[in-house]
C-alpha cells in the first residue's frame, strides 16, 4: 500500500508514523511544506518542533517540494493541514484517482466582508464544491497526536459516503495500537469534530476559574446537547454523537491537558488576551477559528447554542471570563 500524508504538523506526522510502523512493505511518504523542517526531520530522525523525543520509523520517507509523482502513485492521500489550507489542496487533488481523506476539524472561516447570511462550510461541503468527483472522507475521533506517535491505544472513526475511502483508511491505520471504525455519517462526524473544539474552550475557562468538576460536567453534557441539535439540523444521525467523534472526542478535548482548545480557555481565565493565548500555543487551536462560523451556521438553522454563543462573545472581547460564566448561569430555567 502506498500512503501519502500532506503536512508535517503534529497530527500528520503522528499518523504517518503509525502507518509506517506496520512493517508490511508499505510505502509511507510525509510531505513537509518547509524545506528546512523536512531536512531537519531526515537528519535528526524526529519532528523536533511538534513531537520532540519521538523517533520516526526508518520506513517513513520525509519529502519536500515536488509531490505530484508521489500523489500519482498513491493508494491513499491524507491531508494533514489546518482547515484554512484544505480548499487549496482539494482543488489540487480533484482529479486524482486515489481516495483522499482529511484530518482537520472545523468549519471554513467566513471571508472578511461577507454578507450576514454567509456561513462557513464543513470540509465535506468544501470538497463537494471544489472537487465533486473526488472519493473523499475524514479520519476523526478522540486522539492526541503525541499518544498516537508513541503507539498508545487509540480508536478513530473513518467517515465517508464512499465505502472505498473507509476501506482504505481502515487498511492504512487499523493495527495493534489503533482501531479504526467505519461510519457513513460524515455530517455527524464532522459536526462533532468542529463543535467539540469550541466547547473545549468553555471547559478550559471553567477549569481556569476553578469552578469545579460539577460545572465541567454540566458544560460537557449541555455542550453535547448543542452539538447534537446542530448535527440533526444538518442531517446527521443521533447515534453518531454518542460515538467516538461526538462524545468521545468531546470528553477528551474538554478534559485533556494536551488539548490546545482547552488551553485557550485556561489562558483566558488567567487574564491573557486572545492574541496572547494563541501566540503561546505555538500550534493551531481550531476552536478559535471555528467558533464564529459554527454559531453563524446555527443561527441560519435557528438552532440554539448558548455555550457556543458565549464562547464567541468571549473571543470577541464582549465578555470577560467571569462574565461569561455568569451569562450562562443567568439563563432562564427550562426542561432538559
Curated annotation (Swiss-Prot):
Pfam family, one: NAD_Gly3P_dh_C
GO cellular component: a single term: cytosol
Gene3D superfamilies: N-(1-d-carboxylethyl)-l-norvaline Dehydrogenase, domain 2, NAD(P)-binding Rossmann-like Domain
Subcellular localization(s) per the UniProt record: Cytoplasm
Residues annotated as binding NADPH: 11, 33, 105, 145, 260, 284, 286
Primary location group: cytoplasm
UniProt keyword Nucleotide-binding present: yes
One term of GO molecular function: glycerol-3-phosphate dehydrogenase [NAD(P)+] activity
Residue sites binding sn-glycerol 3-phosphate per the record: 105, 141, 143, 196, 249, 259-261
Keywords on record: Cytoplasm, Lipid biosynthesis, Lipid metabolism, NAD, NADP, Nucleotide-binding, Oxidoreductase, Phospholipid biosynthesis, Phospholipid metabolism
Main function: Catalyzes the reduction of the glycolytic intermediate dihydroxyacetone phosphate (DHAP) to sn-glycerol 3-phosphate (G3P), the key precursor for phospholipid synthesis.
Protein name per Swiss-Prot or TrEMBL: Glycerol-3-phosphate dehydrogenase [NAD(P)+]
Organism of origin: Delftia acidovorans (strain DSM 14801 / SPH-1)
The encoding gene: gpsA
